[in-house]
């Protein structure tokens, strides 16, 4: 699945391919639980426990303050994750 990866520590935003399953997302973000929040008609998938950890990196998107790494993915009418329609440049 096409996704945007936000690497909070290295302060980079890039287009990536990630398997459309939770374990792949956990591995890429570096977490055990994810939370999804709406953003620009897409979904920010981030570490649900990010604020409880000692992360020293984060970012803001719109009204959201995210601690740690995140993915931006799209969704289907059924609510499943899908390719993002945004570009990495749209996030920067």
Which residues does each predicted region cover?
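Short beta-rich binding modules
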Residues: 1-92
